């Protein structure tokens, strides 16, 4: 978790460099860097407003159709459709009227609306069941293949299909490779 916060420069590295696209993140314009990197945290934030309002925090100009498409990718559309007011359903401050897994899926959809070049998922599917997690990962592979995805997870199943898996233990690299390796 601390390591990935160096990518959008929430913190700067005390030594060494962090590179995105081969460029030191300190050489990027901070606004540009943060526009191109989306983070979804395990503990996420929803605001008072409709589901659409909350999704549009990712892109204020997103059409309803774009919001629905990203909600489908994040497996949020299936529960949104069960609400009487669908995408116009009111969300309480902090998302107190939706479950933890629903909050996570809404914040994933919101991050996808930004169309980031780098998507950081920090234990962001920990509150969803493994079947839904698998659907989300499949949608990522099929629908946003050009986006770099950095996934921090406790469940092996959440990262087993990753191109590279980095195992850290007390801040040290303990393993690097594919799941099969």
Spans of model-derived segments:
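Helix-to-loop junction immediately C-terminal to a conserved catalytic motif
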Residues: 7-8
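A short, proline-enriched helix->beta-strand linker immediately N-terminal to the Walker B motif
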Residues: 113-117, 146
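Catalytic Walker B motif of ABC-type/P-loop ATPase nucleotide-binding domains
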Residues: 119-122
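ABC ATPase nucleotide-binding domain helical subdomain, centered on the C-loop/LSGGQ "ABC signature"
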Residues: 17-19, 27, 34, 52-93, ...
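Conserved catalytic loops of ABC-family nucleotide-binding domains
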Residues: 142-153, 159
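Conserved catalytic segment of ABC-fold P-loop ATPases
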Residues: 161-167
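ABC ATPase "signature
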Residues: 176-177
């Amino acid at each position: 978790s601390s390591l990935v916060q160096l990518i959008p420069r929430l913190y700067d590295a005390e030594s060494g460099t962090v590179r995105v696209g081969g460029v030191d993140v300190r050489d990027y314009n901070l606004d540009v860097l943060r526009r191109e990197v989306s983070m979804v945290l395990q503990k996420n934030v929803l605001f008072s407003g409709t589901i659409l309002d909350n999704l549009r925090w990712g892109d204020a100009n997103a059409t309803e159709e774009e919001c629905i498409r990203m909600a489908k990718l994040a497996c949020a559309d299936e529960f949104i459709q069960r609400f009487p007011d669908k995408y116009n359903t009111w969300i309480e401050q902090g998302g107190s009227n939706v479950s933890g897994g629903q909050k996570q899926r809404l914040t994933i959809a919101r991050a996808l609306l930004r169309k980031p070049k780098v998507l950081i998922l920090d234990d962001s599917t920990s509150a969803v069941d493994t079947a839904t997690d698998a659907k989300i990962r499949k949608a990522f592979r099929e629908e946003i293949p050009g986006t770099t995805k950095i996934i921090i997870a406790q469940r092996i199943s959440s990262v087993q299909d990753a191109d590279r898996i980095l195992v850290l233990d007390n801040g040290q690299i303990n393993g690097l490779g594919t799941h099969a390796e």
